[in-house]
Amino acid sequence: MLKVNVDKRILDICPQMKIGLIQADVVNGDTCDELWNELLKEADNIKNSYELLAINNRPAVAATRKVYKALGKDPGRYRVASEALCRRIIRGLGLYRLTTLIDVVNLVSIKSGYAISGLDFDKIEGDTLTLGVGEAGEVYNGIGRGALNIENMPVYRDAIGGVATPTSDEERTKFTPETTTVQININGYGPEMDMEETVNLMVDLLKRYAQATNIQTSIVSNFD
């Protein structure tokens, strides 16, 4: 598995951070009806459980927003992806039906509240991902967003640059229909759903819907 390092600036804010890591060989494709129905069922649960303004208070979302604020980033302007998905659901805007891998990650994201990085393993450069802090002027193209200002935002970097933030993953390492190996990081800046349970849920969904094999998992903490 890839090695994961975390910058001291982030650990100083959330010293109890846990990251669930999953690497697996998969088959991507159009989202099947069974997966889509699971996603819709969880969306209904979110809609029935939260008012719009209460989403910010979900423990995992609140913890991620706390990191943004502590680093000097406005989490109201640059929303955490799990928060943005839940807000969209509550506002009645629905979800986009995308591909199997994207919708599996989206399902776990809204259920757990965690910011989840879903990457094409074969597009990652090097053998290490480092979670650090975005710099002024750093080039980063968010998926479907174009240039994203990641200054003072938590960002995973590989050997050549940024690949994931809690707001958006990077175009360079995104899932495509041709993706055959995934690297998924479940980022627990603060606890909500049990991390082992969250990793197991992700693995189960990947097995059922993406024909996952050669699965490796790990939960990392105590980065000192």
Across the structure, where does each feature detected by a protein language model lie?
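Charge-biased, low-complexity intrinsically disordered regions
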Residues: 1-224
